[in-house]
Amino acid sequence: MPQNEYIEQHIKKHGRRLDYEERKRKKEAREGHRVAKDAQTLKGWRAKQFAKKRYAEKVAMKKKIKAHQESKVKGPSTPKAEDGEALPTYLLDRQTNNTAKAISSSIKQKRLEKADKFQVPLPKVKGISEEEMFKVIKTGKSKSKSWKRMITKHTFVGEGFTRRPVKMERIIRPAALRQKKANVTHPELGVTVFLPILGVKKNPQSPMYTQLGVLTKGTIIEVNVSELGLVTAGGKVVWGKYAQITNEPDRDGCVNAVLLV
């Protein structure tokens, strides 16, 4: 063994540290932070050399990604060189359909289907003011603080929902106004089923109301339709489907919705 390979000789003789793999993994994980720090702090000639090296790495990575993507595309997009004769211009677009074109067309078709699929029964709803939605709750020893709000509309919270500590809870969702199930009507079958709510997809009033799970007229909710036995074209059972609320839950005391099919 050459004299300058004493490190390899030591490894072969005594082995590595017990935590070598863990230290190596952590060092590789920190590499991104080190590179980012160097990019911000280096100056002068070292900064130029660093930028040049990073540029070369990025160019190589882009070439590698491009080559990988081109390898996935099936079918010749250009005539083969060994054929001996070139195709005329009017036949250039008559090559064998490749996977990229098929994927592109399928994505466009899915977008069109999605646009047709969600034609909601209530396209417009009346706006609700914050004064109507939230009730101010006075807090503090002398009831002088008014930073808490209580939602006056019906809401949906998930199964694993836990309230925050009382002193830090800014928005209160009363337990008496929480809904877990909805009366969902299937427009084609003409039947109404009492189905559990899975989540609130979109509240037309505000994204904040969507996040809070407020149930108002026109809200799109996701319901569990496994009881209906709906099946996709591929033979899979449909688990969740969207429905739109058609009534005022805070007035009626229940949630009525129409399934979007």
Curated annotation (Swiss-Prot):
Q: Tell me the InterPro entries matching this sequence.
A: NSA2_fam, Ribosomal_Se8/biogenesis_NSA2
Q: Show where the record puts the motif Nuclear localization signal 2.
A: 51-58
User: Entry's Pfam families?
Assistant: Ribosomal_S8e
Under which name does UniProt file this protein?
Ribosome biogenesis protein C3_06160C_A
Q: Where is this motif: Nuclear localization signal 1?
A: 11-18
Any one GO CC term of this protein is:
preribosome, large subunit precursor
Organism listed in the record: Candida albicans (strain SC5314 / ATCC MYA-2876) (Yeast)
What the protein does comes down to: Involved in the biogenesis of the 60S ribosomal subunit. May play a part in the quality control of pre-60S particles.
Q: Which UniProt keywords apply?
A: Nucleus, Ribonucleoprotein, Ribosome biogenesis, rRNA processing
Single biological process term from Gene Ontology: maturation of 5.8S rRNA
Question: Where does it reside?
Answer: Nucleus, Nucleolus
State where composition is biased (Basic and acidic residues). Answer: 17-37
Chain residue ranges for the region called Disordered: 1-38, 59-85
Family affiliation: Belongs to the eukaryotic ribosomal protein eS8 family. Ribosome biogenesis protein NSA2 subfamily.
Complex and partners: Component of the pre-66S ribosomal particle. Interacts with NOP7 and RRP1. Interacts with RSA4 (via WD repeats).
